[in-house]
Amino acid sequence: NGWNDNKTFILIGSASWAALVLLVGSLNSFVI
C-alpha cells in the first residue's frame, strides 16, 4: 500500500512539474 501511495505521489508530482514548466515556457514566449 505504501508503494502505491508513493507511485501516485510521484506521478502527480511529475505531472504538476511538467505543467509548471509548460506554463513558464508559454509565459516566456508571450513576454519575448
UniProtKB/Swiss-Prot annotation:
<feature type="transmembrane region" description="Helical">
    <location>
        <begin position="9"/>
        <end position="31"/>
    </location>
</feature>
<keyword id="KW-0674">Reaction center</keyword>
<comment type="similarity">
    <text>Belongs to the PsbZ family.</text>
</comment>
<keyword id="KW-0934">Plastid</keyword>
<comment type="function">
    <text>May control the interaction of photosystem II (PSII) cores with the light-harvesting antenna, regulates electron flow through the 2 photosystem reaction centers. PSII is a light-driven water plastoquinone oxidoreductase, using light energy to abstract electrons from H(2)O, generating a proton gradient subsequently used for ATP formation.</text>
</comment>
<dbReference type="GO" id="GO:0042549">
    <property type="term" value="P:photosystem II stabilization"/>
</dbReference>
<protein>
    <recommendedName>
        <fullName>Photosystem II reaction center protein Z</fullName>
    </recommendedName>
</protein>
<dbReference type="InterPro" id="IPR036512">
    <property type="entry name" value="PSII_PsbZ_sf"/>
</dbReference>
<keyword id="KW-0150">Chloroplast</keyword>
<dbReference type="GO" id="GO:0009539">
    <property type="term" value="C:photosystem II reaction center"/>
</dbReference>
<dbReference type="Pfam" id="PF01737">
    <property type="entry name" value="Ycf9"/>
</dbReference>
<keyword id="KW-0472">Membrane</keyword>
<dbReference type="GO" id="GO:0009535">
    <property type="term" value="C:chloroplast thylakoid membrane"/>
</dbReference>
<keyword id="KW-0602">Photosynthesis</keyword>
<dbReference type="InterPro" id="IPR002644">
    <property type="entry name" value="PSII_PsbZ"/>
</dbReference>
<keyword id="KW-0793">Thylakoid</keyword>
<keyword id="KW-0604">Photosystem II</keyword>
<keyword id="KW-1133">Transmembrane helix</keyword>
<keyword id="KW-0812">Transmembrane</keyword>
<dbReference type="GO" id="GO:0015979">
    <property type="term" value="P:photosynthesis"/>
</dbReference>
<comment type="subunit">
    <text>PSII is composed of 1 copy each of membrane proteins PsbA, PsbB, PsbC, PsbD, PsbE, PsbF, PsbH, PsbI, PsbJ, PsbK, PsbL, PsbM, PsbT, PsbY, PsbZ, Psb30/Ycf12, at least 3 peripheral proteins of the oxygen-evolving complex and a large number of cofactors. It forms dimeric complexes.</text>
</comment>
